[in-house]
């Protein structure tokens, strides 16, 4: 059933990526050619990689940006040599372009016209969903009920607490669906379905270890879904999101400072803030801010050529994480930094320079903090350290193998008695209790978020959504790789959580925040309503 749910969710996601129909067209009045406008944001210039290439020596490599906003089509000069003329008048800022208006770029005149395809079909075909969202949610509910029922009898006698967990999960899931469908009136719910499915597996797995922690995780799921919708609201307009970026960065830096001053050391890292009996990790929320501040609209990319502000912000974030001793999360930030830098600059040399600087920085840290090397002493040699530094990985490998393809049954595993089993080692618990088949399905589900983001980003309403979706999914996928490869001794064990599934309220809230960026890249999120 888990495979069926994943298949329906992913197929519905991929089938709803709309084909590239032209929105409008530019008619070149010099050579009489019609240039289709395929995207919501289009670069114009002499550069061969521009969306609209102007073959004129008078044009700048990056001359202008032509984009669609609520008020219509907008053209903006991006500090070009000879400027942009609209109906014979030079523009000094962004101006609205209407049908039959003439734009002059580099001596070439382009007349905006309606797309012939749009004229014939009236509107681009865009399906609401390939499968009924409510039907998939019913399947997820049945899956959760059966898993909770197994957990009720896992101890040998009937325990009703797992049914309470299921009831709460059922309520959170269906309330989220009804709010999305009938209050926000969105037609797409597939991303949320996948998130709910993966989160439910994590919460039910945790229920077999500690019921109290499972209730806390459900509360985190509810907060995460609210956070998800808040992010969607904040980035509903790319220009609004751009104005919010500096404030988001300031809030993130304040969180990191609070963490450095008041943070408590837990499991070797000073990244926990304690409030009474509750604790949370500010660095998890900073992940969302990192994506938010790092991305940009096409106009912002073309007019601001350097990455100085983002580099400084990234240095503050990663420096703070290193001071806290959280090298796993610092690695996740670094990979995401490379992704954002490449997507914003498109320059491979920039990436190589960043990696070289990082390598030098790593050697510098090793020189002044040599104790860090001891954390990697068992890497690739865990069976030689079975009772000390390799204790956790050897137990994961042993108990995961005992689960076979179908698992021992929820709550019947032995790995749950090992320290950090439901958080850092949760992949081993999935293999032992749920079976290797479902564990691999979960990994493929997370990995396909990255593939989907890449495909959907081409049709996004703005480069802001494209960059944010690709980098958010990249962060999630890399975090998954570090967690899974760490517990099976392919990579060093860093304490990075498995997205959606691992115990940790801060982590769950954060990953739902990242999921909002992927959701925003779906053209239907803001364009279609019930």
Locations of the language-model features?
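Loop-to-helix entry and N-terminal half of a specific, functionally important transmembrane alpha helix
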Residues: 456-495, 501
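Forkhead-associated
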Residues: 36-108
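A structural signal for hydrophobic alpha-helical transmembrane segments in multi-pass membrane proteins
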Residues: 122-267, 509-521
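Hydrophobic alpha-helical transmembrane segments
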Residues: 168-172, 223-224, 432-451
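Hydrophobic alpha-helical segments of polytopic membrane proteins
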Residues: 304-323, 327-367
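Intrinsically disordered, low-complexity acidic Ser/Thr-rich regulatory segments
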Residues: 1-56, 117-125
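A juxtamembrane structural motif centered on a specific transmembrane helix
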Residues: 483-530
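Hydrophobic, glycine- and aromatic-enriched re-entrant/interface helices and adjoining loop segments
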Residues: 266, 270-272, 279, 352-441, ...
């Amino acid at each position: 059933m888990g495979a069926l749910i994943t298949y329906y969710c992913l197929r519905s996601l991929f089938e709803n990526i709309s084909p590239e129909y032209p929105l409008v067209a530019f008619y070149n009045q010099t050579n009489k050619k019609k240039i289709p406008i395929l995207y919501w944001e289009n670069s114009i210039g002499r550069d061969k990689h521009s969306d609209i290439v102007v073959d004129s020596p008078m044009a700048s490599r990056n001359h202008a940006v032509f984009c669609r906003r609520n008020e219509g089509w907008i053209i903006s000069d991006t500090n070009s040599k000879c400027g942009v003329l609209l109906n014979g008048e030079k523009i000094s800022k962004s101006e609205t372009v209407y049908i039959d208006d003439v734009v002059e770029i580099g001596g070439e005149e382009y007349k905006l016209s309606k797309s012939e395809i749009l004229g014939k079909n009236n509107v681009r075909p865009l399906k609401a969903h390939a499968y009924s969202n409510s039907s998939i949610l019913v399947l997820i509910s049945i899956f959760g009920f059966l898993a909770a029922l197994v957990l009720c009898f896992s101890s040998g006698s009937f325990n009703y607490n797992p049914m309470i967990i299921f009831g709460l999960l059922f309520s959170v899931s269906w309330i989220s669906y009804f709010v999305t469908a009938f209050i926000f009136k969105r037609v797409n719910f597939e991303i949320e379905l996948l998130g709910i499915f993966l989160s439910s597996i994590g919460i039910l797995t945790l229920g077999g270890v500690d019921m109290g922690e499972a209730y806390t995780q459900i509360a985190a799921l509810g907060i995460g879904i609210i956070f998800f919708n808040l992010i969607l609201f904040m980035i509903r307009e790319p220009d609004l999101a751009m104005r919010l970026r500096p404030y988001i960065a300031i809030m993130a830096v304040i969180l990191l400072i609070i963490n450095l001053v008041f943070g408590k050391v837990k499991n070797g890292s000073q990244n926990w803030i304690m409030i009474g009996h509750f604790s949370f990790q500010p660095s998890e929320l900073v992940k969302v801010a990192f994506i938010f501040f790092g991305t940009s609209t096409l106009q912002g990319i073309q007019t601001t050529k350097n990455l100085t502000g983002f580099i400084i912000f990234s240095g503050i974030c990663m420096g703070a994480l290193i001071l806290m001793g959280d090298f796993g999360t610092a690695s996740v930030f670094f990979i995401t930094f490379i992704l954002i830098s490449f997507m914003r600059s498109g320059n491979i040399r920039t990436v190589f320079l960043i990696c070289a600087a990082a390598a030098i920085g790593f050697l510098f840290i090793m020189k002044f903090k040599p104790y860090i090397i001891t954390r990697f002493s068992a890497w690739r040699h865990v069976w030689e350290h079975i009772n000390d530094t390799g204790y956790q990985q050897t137990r994961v490998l042993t108990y995961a193998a005992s689960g076979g393809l179908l698992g021992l049954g929820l709550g019947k595993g032995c790995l749950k008695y090992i320290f950090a089993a439901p958080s850092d080692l949760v992949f081993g618990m999935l293999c032992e209790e749920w079976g290797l088949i479902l564990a691999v399905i979960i990994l493929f589900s997370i990995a396909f978020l990255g593939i989907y983001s890449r495909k959907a980003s081409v049709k996004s309403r703005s480069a802001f959504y494209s960059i944010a979706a690709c980098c958010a999914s990249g962060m999630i996928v890399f975090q998954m790789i570090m967690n899974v490869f760490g517990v099976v001794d392919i990579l060093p064990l860093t304490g990075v959580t498995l997205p959606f599934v691992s115990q940790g309220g801060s982590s769950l809230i954060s990953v739902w925040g990242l999921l909002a960026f992927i959701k925003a890249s779906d053209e239907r999120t803001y364009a279609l309503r019930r």
